[in-house]
Amino acid sequence: MRKNNMKLSVLALVILTLIPFTTIKAQDEVEASVGTDVVSSDVWRGQKLGGFSVQPYVGIDYKGFSLSAWGNVGVESTDDKEIDFTLAYSNGGFSLSLTDYWVDYGTGFLHFAAHDTDHVLEAQIGYDFDVLAINWYTNIAGADGVNADGKRAYSSYVSLTAPFSLGGIDWTAEIGATPWANDYYGANGFSVQEISLMAEKEIEITENFSLPIFAKLACNPATEDTFFVFGLSF
C-alpha cells in the first residue's frame, strides 16, 4: 500500500507539471513563473549537499493553489542532481504543501518501492504571521529515514523565520531543528540543525533590469559546521 500511495502521488505531480502551457495561457487568472538561481554551494537545512550549482524552477499559481518544479545541478562530477515537485495551497498566512524530493543516489526516478527508492515525500503545514513564520515538515513516504530501532522515524523539521529590513537590505533570520531521533538528519534526538541569516538586495543594472543577489551565513550546531553561500537570481 505504501508503494502504491507513493507511486500515485509522485505520478500525479509529474503529470500535472507536464500540462501544456498553451492551455494555461487561456486562463487569465493563472500566473506562471520561471527562473533560476546560481549559488556558490548547495546548502539545505544545515547540510551541504553540493558545490557550485544551478537551480532552475518553474511554477504555476491559480487561486491559492500552486504547482512547481525545482532542480539542482552541480558543476562537479561528485554532485548528485536533484528534481523536486511541489503541490501547495495558501490562503492568507496559512500554507499547506506536498513535496516529492528526488536526489539521484543511483536508484532511477521511476523507482517508488518503499525500500528501493531515492524519492522522499514530505508534507508541510505552516503559518506566516508577517513578523514570524512557523513551518512544520514531516517525511511521510519513500526514503524518509529511520530511528535507532530501524523503524520509520517520520523524520521531521520545524523552522522559524523572521524577516526584517535594515540598511536598505532585506534580511531573514532562521532557526531550524529536527524534534526527534532519525538518520535522515543524522540526529540522536532533538537537534538544532540550522541557525542562519540571509541578506537580499536587487542591484540595478539598467533602468529596466535589476539583478537580485543574496548571501546567507548558516551554522549547524549539531555538526559544528558553518557555511557562507552567495547567489544570483535570474
Language model features with spans:
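Cleavable N-terminal export/targeting peptides
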Residues: 1-31
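Detector for outer-membrane/organellar transmembrane beta-barrel domains
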Residues: 114-182
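Outer-membrane beta-barrel initiation region
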Residues: 27-61
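Outer membrane beta-barrel transmembrane domains
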Residues: 170-205
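Outer-membrane beta-barrel "beta-signal"
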Residues: 197, 203, 223-234
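Transmembrane beta-strand segments that form the barrel wall of outer-membrane beta-barrel proteins
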Residues: 34-42, 65-75, 95-104, 108, ...
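Residues that define the transmembrane beta-barrel architecture of outer-membrane proteins
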Residues: 30, 50-54, 79-83, 92, ...
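Short loop/turn motifs that connect adjacent beta-strands in outer-membrane beta-barrel proteins
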Residues: 26-31, 93, 163-172, 200-213
